[in-house]
Amino acid sequence: MCLSPATIIVFNRKALKKFGGFGGAADSIRNRSDLENLSEYVEYAADMYGWDDIQKYCLAVYQIVKLHPFTDGNKRTAGYVLLNCLRKRGLSYTGREKNLAEQIIELVKTDPGKKEESVLNFSYFIKSRLQKRDIR
């Protein structure tokens, strides 16, 4: 499952290894309970709102950057998680990495009271830049 705590931890470690960070992979988890509840919450909320899988993945990105479960690399981790979930669905993000990073940074800045609007806006951005992967 692309939103399991173990998968999210793997992507945080990859982000720290690739881009560096002050936390170090071994002690990077700041809030394990938020991380463990993330998948269940995202599934519940997406079902409650009637959201599709892309919107659900965007909610996961929002939750990762807002809950900040790691000492470092939360935004980078959220990006990796999103791209992995899309890949597992047979989709590729075709936009520029820089634009994706900017959109994730914008999520961090949003008012928590506008979570639904923020997630939907982010999902529209993502959906407009998706392509089915050619799997041979």
Residue ranges and their predicted role:
Residues 1-136:
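FIC/Doc superfamily catalytic core
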